[in-house]
A protein has these predicted regions:
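Short, amphipathic alpha-helical "lid/cap" segments that border enzyme active or binding sites
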Residues: 50-57, 77-85, 147-162
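Residue-level signal for the nucleotide or nucleotide-sugar donor/cofactor binding architecture
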Residues: 72-75, 107, 138, 148
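Active-site YXXXK catalytic motif of short-chain dehydrogenase/reductase
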Residues: 21-25
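Alpha-helix C-terminal capping segments
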Residues: 26-34, 56-60, 102, 117-120, ...
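C-terminal amphipathic/interface module of NAD(P)-dependent oxidoreductases
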Residues: 122-165
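Active-site "gating" loop of Rossmann-like NAD(P)-dependent oxidoreductase/epimerase domains
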Residues: 1-19
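NAD(P)-dependent short-chain dehydrogenase/reductase
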Residues: 18-19, 29-72, 78-79
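Mid/C-terminal beta-alpha module of Rossmann-like enzyme folds, strongest
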Residues: 81-135, 165
């Protein structure tokens, strides 16, 4: 829901996305009561393998380029499920709209690729490129965000996803 011009967005910030993806997310938030969870997810997709993790794992190239000026704070889908469970236990019948930001510490896409490369032992040469300063990080100072850093999350996710894939 955010353009990425500012970064470290909190739940009170006015959504300012201008692309179709962001605008559809904004329209989905037009509710009076319920829970809205904002997160950038990192995980595998059995049906469509086009996320950053699948791209790295399935890519045949020995090189991968990551943006050094694109910042976000993703969370693995496994950690997201744990956070959602906590939120649902706390909010059994929300009478008002509640917005939660869930994510890890902010990281560049370049550094995320380096961590994925290490955790999955891909042996790829990670190079840097520029996107034109984008910071879509969310302020996640809440009880529901994971205590594990993204590398720890990916290690746990890898063990878990080996059961499925």
């Amino acid at each position: 829901v955010f353009s990425g011009q500012k970064g470290n967005y909190n739940t009170d910030d006015t959504p300012d996305a201008f692309d179709n993806y962001g605008l559809t997310k904004i329209s989905g938030e037009q509710i009076r009561s319920g829970i809205i969870i904002r997160a950038s997810i990192i995980g595998r997709n059995i049906m469509k393998q086009h996320g950053i993790l699948d791209w790295m794992i399935n890519g045949k190239e020995k090189k991968a380029s990551g943006y050094v000026d694109y910042i976000f704070n993703g969370i693995t889908t496994l950690e997201l499920v744990k956070s959602i469970e906590k939120i649902l236990k706390k909010n059994k019948n929300p009478k008002n709209k509640k917005i939660y930001h869930i994510g890890s510490s902010a990281i560049t896409k370049h550094n995320l690729l380096r961590i994925i490369n290490k955790v999955y032992n891909l042996r790829k040469d990670i190079t840097s490129k520029r996107a034109g300063k984008i910071n879509r990080s969310l302020s996640t100072n809440n009880f529901f965000s994971p205590k594990k850093n993204i590398e720890q999350q990916l290690i746990e996710y890898k063990k878990f996803s080996n059961i499925i894939y």
